[in-house]
Amino acid sequence: MVDKIERIKELVEILNKYSYDYYVLDNPSVSDKDYDKEYDELKLLEKETGFVLPYSPTLRIGDVVLQGFNKYTHKGKLWSLDKAQSLDEIKDWHNRNIKFVNEMRAQGEDLPDLKYIATKKFDGLTVNLTYNKGGMLEVSATRGNGEIGENVTSQVKTIKSIPLKLQENDDLFEVHGEAIMTQEAFEKYNASADIPLKNLRNGAAGALRNLNIKETARRDLSAFFYDVGYKEGYQFKTYLEMMDFIKEKGLPIDEYLKVCTSIDDIKKEIEYIEKIRFDLNYDIDGLVIAIDDIRTRELLGYTVKYPKWAIAYKFEAQEATTKLLDVEWNVGRSGRIGPTAILEPVELAGVTVKRATLNNMDDIKRKGVRIGADVFVRRSNDVIPEIMGTLENTLENSEEICPPTECPACGSHVVLNGAHYFCENTLSCKPQLVKTIVHYASRDAMNIAGFSEKTAEQLFEKLNIKSISDLYKLKKEDLINLEKFGEKKSENLLNAIEKSKDCKLYSFIYALGIPNVGVKTAKDIVNKFKSIDGLKNATFEELVSVQDVGDIVAQDVIEFFKEEKVINTIDELLNLGVNPIFDEVKIVESIFKDKTVVTTGTLQNYSRTEIKTKLESLGAKVSGSVSKKTDYVIAGESAGSKLTKAEELGVKIISEEEFEKMLGRES
């Protein structure tokens, strides 16, 4: 028993070191296979002995669903920052600082010349971590009102870059940071999500405010830390010294820390960050400029709301205010009934916005949204606009938004499942069936050319097509009398339907519309199980062993294939001649095998999809962003910030011509 406990302690130390190397230093020190082997050994030993260290990596993802959030009082206040939206406002602030320093010097204070540190302003959710004298992560909390936040320790523990125990620590301290969702994590989550996330910020905020810890873990959040709000013992002399302390403790920081000594320096940094912001793998909404010298900060002090020694330069907002005219309830493919806001038209980021997203009734209540009131609308990175909140002074004479009592499409009974309402009529509810057929026919699914939602609606209304299998029973005489369907169009559609019978297995699995199974997940599970029967009979343990398949997806797959209606539909499709084929991907032995490759710019001989497919056939991992883990960057014409970052990190850069020569040397 003693030997096993010693081995547990050893494994925890080793695995935490691996995580630090991978997530903080961006420099993996072990293969995924070796990490998984030692992680599995640790899980087994913990189960056998019942001994689990409070900073064990196995505690990062639990089966816990919490009952609610407890309040936490911060030891040091988390202040908001005053905001500037023009360089003139920054100049005014700078001039006030100069005047103050000169006045203090006249009174005998030995203050240094003003030096500012510019950092990115992350657009996520602020978190405050408390580490005790032993270095243990004691509490993690949201900002709240700056003095009292909500305890989200279990949620924050899922962020793999955050150490659960520091190697060395003598003094209790609180450290402030921002929990964020990267673009990569966002795309990966949405590829298999039944309800896709709208933007990165909501992805992060929603994860930390989710009581289901496994769902939080699925979001795969990251974090950056930038401030020590409270510390016992030694106090810092400068902000740069503080940042060195944060880094030395093993907490992730952003390497962008620019020293500015003049307005011209600040202007250059603003221009630089504005130029690269949309090439970053995460969202930022501005630049923070803060005085470096701590004594100067102490003397400057605070207003009621803000520290006087820092200011945030905010990029042009993509928000506007308008009136909520109505709420429309729409039925999706899964039967989920979702609210859409009907707005008084408003110009936002160069587009006239008339509709916006409202996620569910919980979201409506939390934001205090009411019909007739004015609402804040945000449009981020060309996604569907979303309502962010309500102007309280416009609530008079507004109307409460009521949830649906019946399906708005078919009038059937609705049920509340979690935060969402669902129509139970899966047999004849038009939007459900139409969208199911449209999804089945879509390009990434069965790729039935010329098939549209309008076509699906006509098939439902005029020909009583209510199942995907009914598509293969259509005849020319059925189609020819439909609106805008002549002989030629009817023949083309029938040929496309016939052609779809010979399909790839992963396309067929994706076409079936399994909840939370996107194209990538369909490919991954097909590569594991290789046939429909293999997937039908897959166990929970077998499913979660597939890369990127978690408990929720695994359970969704199992429940899907339990439904008699699903099995009958699949059997009918196969009897009608649908022939899903599994093509084993043959990885060519290549210099690119197991290498991480990023492409940037325009290539002459490959589209984006073609180069990705080519690299994957060579065994490469294709990434959308450059990091220290990147092995090669293939640079085409008009290569942008990815090329610049690769040069800064010393990543091997090759041209398209060099790429093909490397392949030629291998053949």
UniProtKB/Swiss-Prot annotation:
The keyword Transmembrane helix does not apply. GO terms for cellular component: cytosol. It comes from the Bacteria. GO terms for biological process: DNA repair; DNA replication. Its cofactor is Mg(2+); Mn(2+). Zn(2+) binds at C407, C410, C423, C429. InterPro entries: BRCT_dom, BRCT_dom_sf, DisA/LigA_HHH, DNA_ligase, DNAligase_adenylation, DNAligase_N, Hlx-hairpin-Hlx_DNA-bd_motif, NA-bd_OB-fold. It catalyses: NAD(+) + (deoxyribonucleotide)n-3'-hydroxyl + 5'-phospho-(deoxyribonucleotide)m = (deoxyribonucleotide)n+m + AMP + beta-nicotinamide D-nucleotide. Its EC number is 6.5.1.2. NAD(+) binds at D32, K33, D34, Y35, D36, S80, L81, R143, E178, K314. The active site is at K121 (n6-amp-lysine intermediate). Disulfide bonds: none annotated. It is an enzyme of class 6 (ligase). CDD domains: BRCT_DNA_ligase_like (cd17748), H3TH_FEN1-XPG-like (cd09897), LIGANc (cd00114). Residues 587-667 form the BRCT domain. The keyword Membrane does not apply. One of its GO terms (molecular function) is DNA binding. Keywords: DNA damage, DNA repair, DNA replication, Ligase, Magnesium, Manganese, Metal-binding, NAD, Zinc. PANTHER family: CHROMOSOME TRANSMISSION FIDELITY FACTOR 18, DNA LIGASE. DNA ligase that catalyzes the formation of phosphodiester linkages between 5'-phosphoryl and 3'-hydroxyl groups in double-stranded DNA using NAD as a coenzyme and as the energy source for the reaction. It is essential for DNA replication and repair of damaged DNA. Belongs to the NAD-dependent DNA ligase family. LigA subfamily. This is DNA ligase.
